[in-house]
């Protein structure tokens, strides 16, 4: 597999649908990790710009929760609590004692668990939405294909946020 100079896996130009979806999802996961690399704890906690309180550390925590929600709760139908506790259901809230290492470990654990849950599933296999989520896309559930495309979109959107936050912190752009 080819990688970018910063170590992110380059998605193949030609592959079957499943391989392509997994590769793009992994590329965007790696992009978030790159955006957080080389920074000190206080930098990871810097908010983007008022009135937003979004931080790079909060984005990592949020994506851990997003991974858990879509692969464990929706696709596998598991009843699992929020990664960082009930009071932080979306993952954005920061805790003074939790730094990047702990947040990344939780995020990577959720990524690994998601991979396990979908390893033998087909792209047309369906997950089940909560009533709140069903209101957005309908009550027929969503296919694994839909979930993977949504996850790519979720990472791409938040990587754009991460790009702006990182540039504000130390001027680093790209990736």
Curated annotation (Swiss-Prot):
> What keywords is this UniProt entry annotated with?
Transposable element
The highest taxon in the source lineage is Bacteria
Tell me the disulfide pairings in this chain. none
Answer whether the UniProt record assigns the keyword Coiled coil to this protein.
no
Supply the InterPro entries for this chain. Answer: DinB/YfiT-like, MST-like
- What is the name of the protein in this document? Mini-circle uncharacterized 19.1 kDa protein
Give the species.
Streptomyces coelicolor (strain ATCC BAA-471 / A3(2) / M145)
């Amino acid at each position: 597999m080819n990688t970018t100079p910063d170590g992110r896996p380059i998605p193949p130009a030609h592959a079957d649908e499943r391989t392509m979806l997994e590769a793009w999802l992994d590329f965007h996961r790696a992009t978030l990790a790159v955006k957080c690399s080389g920074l000190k704890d206080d930098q990871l906690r810097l908010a983007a710009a008022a009135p937003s309180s979004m931080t790079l550390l909060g984005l990592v925590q949020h994506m851990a929760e997003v991974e858990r929600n879509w692969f464990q709760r929706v696709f596998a139908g598991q009843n699992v609590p929020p990664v960082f506790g009930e009071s932080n259901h979306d993952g954005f809230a920061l805790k003074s004692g939790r730094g990047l290492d702990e947040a990344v470990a939780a995020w990577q654990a959720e990524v690994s668990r998601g991979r396990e849950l979908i390893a033998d599933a087909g792209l047309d296999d369906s997950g089940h939405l909560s009533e709140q989520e069903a209101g957005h896309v309908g009550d027929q559930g969503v296919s694994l294909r839909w979930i993977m495309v949504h996850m790519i979109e979720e990472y791409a959107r938040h990587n754009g946020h991460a790009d702006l936050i990182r540039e504000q912190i130390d001027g680093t752009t790209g990736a």
